[in-house]
Amino acid sequence: AGKVSQEIIDAIDAAGLGKNLEVLGYVSHDEALKLQRQAALLLLIEIDAPITKGIIAGKLFEYLAAARPILAVGPADGDVQDIIEQTKAGAYFSYGSIEAIKTFILNSFESFNLSDYLSKNNLEIEKYHRRNLTERLATIIKN
């Protein structure tokens, strides 16, 4: 869902994958969250620049709440990578890790189980719930 550039659509078509692509355009936030919970795999792509290592997109927290596996791509050794590895919520790859990404996708679909993929990591993921993050921030401010 959302805006997809024509360049990306053309690249998907050129790779012979156009028949697997459904461009939904913009949807409501509630609909986006529903789609996330229904997904077999969630894709999070960060800008490939060292400056983004310390930037955590809000989408990551929505993805964690969706309890679906996350395939993230971005610069190595950043905060997003740390969170994904700590929560075991998926896998993080640097740009150019094509074979490793392919293997992760294939393994994810082979072991796909909508009901319990991330349930075993729920405690780690719960640390990043908005309520818990707000509580931690309030404690920091008070002290």
Walk through the language-model features, giving the residues of each:
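Short acidic alpha-helix that forms the nucleotide-activated donor recognition element
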Residues: S28-A39, A65
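Nucleotide-activated donor-binding/catalytic signature segment of Leloir-type glycosyltransferases, i.e.
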Residues: G2, Q6-L33
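Acidic donor-binding loop of glycosyltransferase active sites
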Residues: N20, Q36-K53
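Short alpha-helical segment that forms part of, or immediately flanks, the ligand-binding pocket
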Residues: L33, G58-A66, Q81-D82
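A charged, aromatic-enriched C-terminal amphipathic alpha-helix characteristic of glycosyltransferases
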Residues: G96-A100, N113-K142
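Short hydrophobic beta-strand element within catalytic cores of glycosyltransferases
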Residues: L41-L44, E62-G74
